[in-house]
Curated annotation (Swiss-Prot):
Record's keyword terms, sorted: Coiled coil
Biased composition (Low complexity): 326-345, 399-414, 455-480, 673-729
Biased composition annotated in UniProt, kind: Acidic residues: 265-278, 362-373
Amino acid composition bias (Polar residues), ranges on this chain: 377-398
Domain of life of the native organism: Eukaryota
Organism annotation: Dictyostelium discoideum (Social amoeba)
UniProt keyword Cell membrane, yes or no: no
Listed name of the protein: Putative uncharacterized protein DDB_G0285031
Organism classification: Eukaryota, Amoebozoa, Evosea, Eumycetozoa, Dictyostelia
Length: 795
């Protein structure tokens, strides 16, 4: 809640920074950004008046004015990161800010030009969007506060947003904030007069198609009406032309004119690009998506979440290449091979004309926003991968290789004359690396003199289309080769770091960790986690199957990244209040070697696939507005998933602290079970002693169940006594070591009592029964503070 209150206070401070002098009184807040040039010219006049009165340097005024605004924007970005919003101004705003400050400081003689350059930057064009976004955030904050408050008071106070201007959509399905669309100022005035009570949860946003004169008429109606009004208009082109003509009349230097024209033309092009962005506003808004060169704003929706992760990567594969190699053998034994590569364009690179025909778009370097070097997209590379003979046959060049190369070059020249296309190859994703990469002038080919190579076309398309950059990719579809370390991973010791229901905050990114361990509780450093640094992502979750279910039982996407050697990090974005369950199970295909030993001890399985869920799966997350769960909710959530999680029941009567650790209750419950078990063991020992005494006294008080044992084993009574005593000591030691193990767990300790099986009694004393003990000592090593993990996505 502190972050939300800081966000409200910051929005009010930002609005007061650009507040007009004609604000109504009695607490109503009015922000006028109707015409950016006119509004900031008034600010410029005020600065000149202050400069004349105080006789200060105008450059200092410009610097102080720009620095305060930039500090506000940086503060807003930091708050928005904590709030879980991917905002604008990460690249455009800060980069343009540096350029404009250097230009303003260099031209210190002409103050009017420097102020215009500062005013007409993308910074001030984005201020209206930031203020509008803040007003929408305030409405969502009011709604969430009322939602939490209505659970007790059961009052309905719905926030209303009055949108004056043109709206694109009028859908009334499952939206969060009610929006009343009014096309003109007259309709809005008539509507506001019909409102009987002054609603504090009402906001007004005036769109850019309303003229300034009409806005002033609307302001006259709000003398005593506590409504937050956001007015914004973009720059008018007619006013710009008039200003250009006036400046051309006053200016005399032709060089200065050319520079000014070039600067203004660039600014106009940037403004036109920004003005093309459409705002999809509905009656009940769910999210606001503003596109500034792949920078998205998402507030609250589960459908936009997938695009939220995908578009943050800023990567689009332009081509998908399919390679087919055929080799023919003649009667004389000579081989003729041909290798053809055809690029297939994706949907992102194909546009539809008005006639319905497909038209290929131009390949601009600006479309590819990856961190990779763009030169590799314009060059042809040849690879020489060092792999086994199952994929490619690598050998030293021979005379036959040279003959094949010459034949292939001749065939390629003939194909080029006919109209063959030149090969163009692009790596399918950023995680795919090409080793031994070197540019050549010829086309890519593989020399295979001793073996015929046939590449499956469908298999290669699956490898390139289903890349590991998708955050919700499953390990079975990733086509990753099973490495030797996968056989070491054991589902009994691999675990989530959090073993109790975790409280998370709606609107913040929640993270957890998964540790891959073997049967001896040692970490398993896979190639993917050990070769990449911490924070690298997105990656595939192989060899784990991960599923994330939301409050409405829908499958949600998640983001998988590297935390350390053998440690996965899982992040997701909770957008609504409710319970999120993240479950993980071991991939059955990638762990066949490890499962063969376990299948022998599972009643032969009868052909049924065994449940390979890792420890603490599923992990439960409760998302609320304040990120707090009561102890009763923890107990109910824990007990509801007891069958799946194989954990004991909780007892909250012993403690009164709100910050409860699940390990305390596990230890307490196990101590109680151990006390009961010790009592049972003492009773068992007494019963065994009594039975042994009865056997030594010629079986005077034999039971019906032990007649056969006493008749067949009269000569081995002393050995059985010693064996039973040793067996009870082993049981007590194993029970004390496994305090966190439940008594009723199927994979837990097998308690051995006085009624042993007939097979064991008939066997020799050397063949002692084996104890199936699951090592659960990892749970005690978990840090208590690591259960509630909150992370933010870096912009």
């Amino acid at each position: 809640m502190d972050i939300l209150l800081n966000l409200i206070n910051y929005s009010n401070n930002l609005k007061s920074q650009i507040k007009n002098n004609n604000n109504p009184e009695n607490g109503s807040i009015v922000v006028l950004l109707s015409n950016i040039s006119n509004d900031f010219e008034e600010i410029k006049d005020l600065q000149y008046k202050q400069q004349q009165q105080q006789q200060q340097n105008p450059n200092n005024i410009i610097k102080t004015f720009s620095n305060t605004i930039f500090k506000r924007i940086k503060h807003f970005i930091s708050i928005s990161i904590n709030f879980g919003i991917k905002t604008i101004a990460t690249k455009l705003l800060l980069i343009k800010k540096r350029k404009n400050i250097t230009s303003s400081t260099s031209t210190s003689t002409c103050t009017t030009i420097t102020i215009d350059k500062i005013i007409n930057t993308i910074l001030f064009e984005n201020l209206n969007i930031i203020i509008k976004l803040l007003s929408l955030i305030e409405m969502i904050i009011i709604r969430e506060y009322n939602y939490c408050k209505n659970t007790i008071t059961q009052q309905q106070q719905q926030p209303i947003l009055i949108w004056i201007g043109n709206s694109t959509n009028n859908n009334n399905k499952n939206k969060k904030i009610k929006i009343i669309n009014l096309e003109s100022i007259e309709k809005s005035i008539n509507y506001l007069k019909t409102i009987k009570q002054q609603n504090k949860n009402t906001r007004i946003i005036i769109d850019n198609d309303i003229p300034l004169d009409h806005i002033k008429q609307l302001l006259s109606q709000f003398n005593n009406f506590p409504i937050n009004i956001i007015c914004f208009k973009n720059k008018c082109k007619n006013n710009e032309k008039e200003k250009k003509e006036e400046e051309e009349d006053h200016d005399h230097d032709h060089d200065d004119k050319k520079k000014e024209k070039e600067d203004k033309e660039k600014e106009e092009e940037e403004e036109e690009e920004d003005s093309n962005d459409d705002f999809e506003i509905n009656d009940y808004i769910t999210f606001l998506s503003i596109d500034f060169n792949n920078h998205f704003i998402s507030l609250s929706n589960t459908e936009i979440l997938y695009d939220y992760f995908i578009n943050s990567m800023n990567y689009k594969p332009k081509f998908i290449t399919t390679t087919t190699t055929t080799t023919t053998t003649t009667v004389n034994g000579s081989k003729n091979s041909s290798n053809t590569t055809t690029p297939i364009t994706t949907k992102d690179d194909i546009d539809l004309d008005s006639d319905g025909e497909k038209k290929e778009s131009d390949d601009d370097d600006d479309d590819d926003l990856t961190d990779e070097d763009t030169s590799q997209h314009n060059e042809i590379y040849s690879t020489s991968p060092k792999v086994s003979h199952s994929t490619f046959c690598q050998s030293s060049p021979t005379l036959l290789d040279l003959d094949l190369q010459q034949q292939q070059q001749q065939q390629q020249q003939q194909n080029d004359k006919i109209g063959g296309q030149q090969e163009k190859q692009i790596t399918p994703n950023r995680s795919y690396t090409i080793r031994n990469m070197k540019p050549v002038s010829n086309q890519r080919y593989y020399s295979t003199p001793n073996k015929t190579v046939i590449i499956n076309q469908q298999q290669q398309q699956q490898q390139q289309q289903q890349s590991s950059t998708s955050p919700s990719i499953s390990p079975s579809s990733s086509n990753i080769k099973s490495e030797p370390n996968f056989a070491r991973i054991d589902y009994k010791t691999s675990m989530f770091i959090s073993n109790k229901p975790v409280a998370i905050t709606t609107g913040k990114v929640a993270t957890t960790q998964i540790h891959l361990r073997d049967a001896l509780d040692n970490p398993v450093p896979t190639n993917l986690t050990s070769s990449n640094p911490s924070g690298f992502g997105p990656i595939s979750s192989s060899p784990l199957h991960l599923t994330l279910l939301g409050p409405t039982n829908e499958i949600l996407p998640f983001y998988c990244f590297v935390v350390g050697s053998g440690i996965f990090g899982i992040s997701f974005f909770p957008t609504i209040h409710g319970i999120y369950t993240l479950s993980a199970s071991l991939d059955y295909n990638n762990n066949n070697n490890n499962n063969n030993n376990n299948n022998n001890n599972s009643n032969n399985n009868n052909g049924i696939k065994k449940d390979l869920s890792i420890k603490n799966s599923p992990t439960i997350f409760k998302s609320t507005a304040d990120g707090i769960i009561s102890p009763n909710e923890i107990r109910s959530l824990h007990n509801s998933n007891e069958k799946k999680r194989k954990l004991p029941l909780l007892d909250f009567e012993s403690t009164s602290n709100d910050s409860i650790d699940l390990l305390d209750f596990i230890i307490d419950s196990v101590d109680k079970n151990n006390n009961n078990n010790n009592n049972n063991n003492n009773n068992n020992n007494n019963n065994n002693n009594n039975n042994n005494n009865n056997n030594n006294n010629n079986n005077n008080n034999n039971n019906n169940n032990n007649n056969n044992n006493n008749n067949n084993n009269n000569n081995n009574n002393n050995n059985k006594e010693n064996h039973n005593q040793n067996q009870n000591e082993i049981e007590n030691e194993n029970k004390n070591e496994n305090e966190n193990e439940n008594e009723n767990d199927k994979n837990g300790i097998i308690f051995i009592n006085q009624n042993l099986n007939k097979e064991f009694n008939e066997s020799s004393p050397e063949m002692s029964p084996t104890l199936q003990v699951e090592d659960d000592s990892n749970i005690s090593a978990v840090n208590n503070d690591s259960s509630e993990i909150e992370a933010t996505l870096a912009i």
